[in-house]
Design a protein with these regions (language model features):
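Radical SAM [4Fe-4S] cluster-binding motif and immediate context
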Residues: 173-344, 355
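Glycine-rich beta-alpha loop elements in corrinoid/cobalamin-binding modules
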Residues: 39-169
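Conserved C-terminal portion of the radical SAM core fold
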Residues: 4, 65-67, 234-251, 277, ...
């Protein structure tokens, strides 16, 4: 029998958490239903845990065909493995599929691809199930790859031929599932001694109706939606719960679009977590422009702490930018009403923005963030650097030229791992300049993003800023401009030192001379924001003494007793790693009402009960656990904020 290997490597997070290889699992689940393939091929392994290249390759013996699932996070690793395999087994057919290998259109601009990657025999374009089946069947015959649809194959002298497209699957619900046909049972059994915590993927819908230019599934090819039935999803999720899967990643780009089915999915997840304890968490991308439909679903998920928050994926609030990326957002009035509704329902909201988009200016970028603050969005905002994905318009020279997009290669945006040395260091192409933002302005925007994240959206000065916004009508922009300018000149302070270090670090990132993020004492990389919070809380008392000094010198000094109350409130509004919860807090002013409800400031005896969310408190000084659970896992729902209840209401 011919040996098949499938390769879909992922990082091992915290040495125990790894993603089951959904893409290659789907490929094999379909192919093995073909009796000719079943008779003539043996799936020797699906390799999905990164390791040193030599150890990884040692798992492969006498392969006939190897299929690589390629993404931005494993591209360099796959290339190195494929090169070694080709040298060792020159007759092996190496097939690249996934999202990162060049599309047929992109190959028009990358005519030297097979010269640079001579070890690759062919590329699969679009969905892979039907195409890979054809490849395996033709491999048993004359190896006339021109008979296979949906591929580009290498010919003589690194030239290539692209065949006709494979039609999309019209009924993905009828396709076999690796969760249900035993494919993943074998993998779980193989690694049971490792005690891995598995992440699994479900695909409620394949495709997306939107055409966002930064997204790989924004092409016409994927525009028509194909959805799976609740009954099939139910069986898959039950398998995950039975196998103690901790984290489910929903590949549906618009969860909530099919609200009846998706509500059933949410209720099932809650039921299984209550009954069996798994899954612990569920991540999804919510339906765009359909926020009101998502609220009932998010409320259900929130019952059992499955929800990471309801997303508003704005990407930008600047109209010329939205036009350039073919994106339409909700109006300002709707946004305000939606945020208000979610607050009334006690639903955490987080917003997504992208830094480096076409037509965005430094001022429009800043204005967008402060607009969100002014609309009472004080929960997490994820602001992500724009990574150039090759099979998007950002890989098109015409589009790039039109908007003056320039990029630099940086280290991969991978965090919470220790095995970055295992195989090639992945890299990413991050936008460093556009026709509306110079490189220096991009760097400044990164500094602003980081600064506002640690100070406001991670909460360290948020409640002070909100107090003075309501009490003295000091705008958020004015407050944070003063805060930044004050501490940038004081490098001997906690915040000033962090500002200085980040400015150096982000320049080094774009010069490709360092990784993204900070190494902490657990030996792993953490995002810059997470790592800075960790370092600030290591010096919390000094940090807040210096913040108090800033307030007195730059903001307000008329009544120091008011400053004392707001400082005490601010410190207790965040979960502190060495505090015992719950406890009571006594203040001389109704700071809570001023901050939360914009009430007039009143003097008196005010008593508050301070607590944390269940399982998000009482860390007994374990700062790594505190930072992991609150600022890594729990940031989107604002777990780092304490729950404050007034006894004076």
């Amino acid at each position: 029998m011919e040996n098949i290997y499938l390769v879909e490597p992922s990082f091992l997070y915290e040495d125990i958490q790894v993603r089951l290889p959904y893409s290659t699992g789907l490929i094999w689940s379909h192919c093995k239903t073909n009796k000719i393939i079943e008779k003539n091929y043996k799936l020797s392994d699906i390799l999905f845990v990164r390791d040193r290249i030599d150890k990884f390759v040692d798992n492969i013996y006498n392969p006939s065909v190897i299929g690589f699932s390629c993404f931005v996070w494993n591209w360099a690793f796959n290339n190195e493995v494929a090169k070694v395999i080709k040298e060792k087994y020159p007759d092996c057919v190496i097939v690249y599929g996934g999202q990162h290998q060049p599309s047929a259109d992109r190959l028009k601009h990358e005519k030297d691809f097979f010269k640079k990657h001579s070890y690759v025999n062919m590329l699969v374009h679009g969905e892979g199930e039907l195409t890979f089946e054809q490849i395996l069947l033709e491999n048993l015959k004359e190896k006339d790859w021109s008979k296979v649809t949906g591929i580009t194959y290498q010919t003589n002298n690194y030239k290539f031929v692209t065949t006709l497209s494979t039609p999309r699957i019209t009924d993905i619900d009828s396709m076999p599932s690796p969760y249900l046909d035993g494919t993943f049972n074998n993998l779980v059994e193989k690694y049971k001694d490792k005690n891995f915590r598995f992440t699994c993927t479900i695909e409620g819908v394949r495709g997306c109706p939107y055409r966002c230019t930064f997204c790989e599934i924004g092409s016409l090819y994927f525009q028509k939606l194909q959805r799976q039935s609740f009954n099939k999803l139910k069986k898959e999720i039950e398998w995950m719960s039975e196998n103690k899967v901790v984290y489910i990643d929903n590949a549906d780009s618009n969860f909530g679009l099919f609200e009846d089915r998706d509500l059933k999915v949410a209720k099932l997840l809650v039921y299984l977590k209550k009954k069996k304890g798994f899954p612990i968490s569920f991540r999804n991308d919510w339906a765009k422009d359909r926020g009101e439909r998502c609220i009932p679903i998010a409320k259900v998920l929130n019952e059992e702490d499955l929800n990471k928050g309801l997303t508003l994926a704005f990407q930008s609030l600047y109209e010329p930018t939205l036009k350039a990326i073919m994106r339409k957002n909700v109006t300002g009035k709707y946004m305000k009403e939606f945020l208000k509704k979610c607050k009334e329902e006690n639903l955490p909201i987080y917003v997504e923005l992208i830094l480096g988009l076409p037509e965005e200016t430094l001022e429009s970028f800043k204005r967008g963030i402060f607009t969100l603050m002014n609309n009472n969005q004080h929960n997490y905002i994820g602001i992500y650097p724009l990574s150039i994905l090759p099979n998007t318009p950002f890989g098109d020279p015409v589009y790039i030229k039109k908007y003056g997009v320039k990029y630099r290669k940086t280290k991969s945006l991978s965090y919470h791992i220790t095995n970055t040395e295992m195989g090639s260091q992945e890299d990413e192409k991050i936008v460093c300049e556009t026709n509306t933002m110079t490189h220096e302005e991009i760097l400044k925007a990164h500094n602003i993003r980081w600064f506002l994240m640690i100070c406001h959206f991670f909460g360290t000065t948020q409640f002070i800023a909100r107090f003075f916004k309501n009490y003295l009508d000091i705008s958020y922009e004015s407050f944070y401009d003063k805060l930044y300018e004050y501490f940038i000149k004081k490098e001997d302070t906690v915040l000033g030192d962090e500002i200085k270090k980040f400015k150096v670090a982000i320049k080094e990132v774009f010069n490709d001379s360092r990784y993204w993020g900070w190494y902490l004492e657990d030996g792993r990389t953490w995002e810059f924001d997470e790592g800075s919070i960790f370092k600030i809380f290591k010096q919390k008392d000094q940090f807040y003494r210096e913040i108090r000094r800033f307030i007195v010198e730059e903001i307000y000094a008329d009544d120091l007793s008011i400053i004392d109350s707001i400082m005490e409130y601010q410190e207790n509004a965040l979960i502190i790693p060495d505090k015992k919860y719950p406890y009571k807090l006594n203040l001389d002013y109704n700071i809570h009402d001023v901050v939360k409800n914009n009430k007039n400031l009143m003097n008196g005896d005010y008593v508050y009960d301070i607590d944390g969310m269940p399982k998000s408190k009482n860390y007994n000084g374990d700062m790594i656990k505190w930072c992991r659970e609150l600022y890594w896992w729990g940031r989107k729902e604002g777990r780092y904020k304490s729950i404050i209840r007034s006894y004076n209401d």
